[in-house]
Amino acid sequence: MAKHGKKYRAARATIDPAKRYTFQEALELATGSIFCKFDETLDIAVRLGVDPRHADQMVRGTVVLPNGLGKPVRVLVFAKGEKVKEALDAGADHAGGDELVDRIKEGWLEFDKTVATPDMMGAVGKIGKVLGPRGLMPNAKLGTVTFDLQKVVKEIKAGKVDFRVEKTGIVHAPMGKVSFGQEKLIQNISAFIDTLIRLKPTAAKGTYVRGIAISTTMGPGIQIDPLAVKTIVA
């Protein structure tokens, strides 16, 4: 296992591993100990009281962060006819049909998110083995298989985040750039956790939000008191 550098260890030394902080305290620690020259992303991990092995306890969804992610998102739309122009007018970086499928077959992957109209899913399915493992496959449950391209493309460009609970019961998601400042980051976190709570499966028993941690791209994790959720979510 690689050893952490002096700056990382210094940042970790400011954190009490036994303490569960408020969101404000945790953000002050996370953003106050930045030691990299680039604008780091703040990530959140929420441990839920669900068992994802059971279909009725799966948590999966999307949220449009009020302050975005602070980075450009390259959107590719699989469409044909007038829908190609609609996608491009909405802000898509790439839009087209079989020609894009062929480019991807050849190894082209210069995009971050994909959307498809339902009538294109047959063609898109041919590159499922390329897109699927990379988390790039359009998905009806996440709203990325649709004819309403204007709405979806604009949401993605504005900072739409897809998430799903992992086998361990943890959900990970980016919350924006450290440079946003505490107020905007808390607004993003609030929107995300509010969405998680709304998606609580009826089959989930006991405490739902069991653990929360935040970290910057290169920084150590900071534990947050799950009860602090009440201070940022109505």
Curated annotation (Swiss-Prot):
GO CC terms: large ribosomal subunit
- GO BP terms, alphabetized: regulation of translation; translation
* Keyword presence, RNA-binding: yes
Q: Which InterPro entries match?
A: Ribosom_uL1_bac-type (IPR005878), Ribosomal_uL1 (IPR002143), Ribosomal_uL1-like (IPR023674), Ribosomal_uL1/biogenesis (IPR028364), Ribosomal_uL1_3-a/b-sand (IPR016095), Ribosomal_uL1_CS (IPR023673)
Q: Which domain of life is it from?
A: Bacteria
What PROSITE patterns is this protein classified in?
RIBOSOMAL_L1
Q: Spell out the Pfam families in the cross-references.
A: Ribosomal_L1 (PF00687)
Q: Does the keyword Secreted apply?
A: no
Can you name one GO molecular function term for this protein?
rRNA binding
Keywords, A to Z, come to: Repressor, Ribonucleoprotein, Ribosomal protein, RNA-binding, rRNA-binding, Translation regulation, tRNA-binding
Q: Please give the family membership noted in the entry.
A: Belongs to the universal ribosomal protein uL1 family.
| Primary role | Binds directly to 23S rRNA. The L1 stalk is quite mobile in the ribosome, and is involved in E site tRNA release.
Question: Assembly and partners?
Answer: Part of the 50S ribosomal subunit.
Q: Provide the protein name.
A: Large ribosomal subunit protein uL1
**Source species taxonomy:** Bacteria, Pseudomonadati, Thermodesulfobacteriota, Syntrophobacteria, Syntrophobacterales
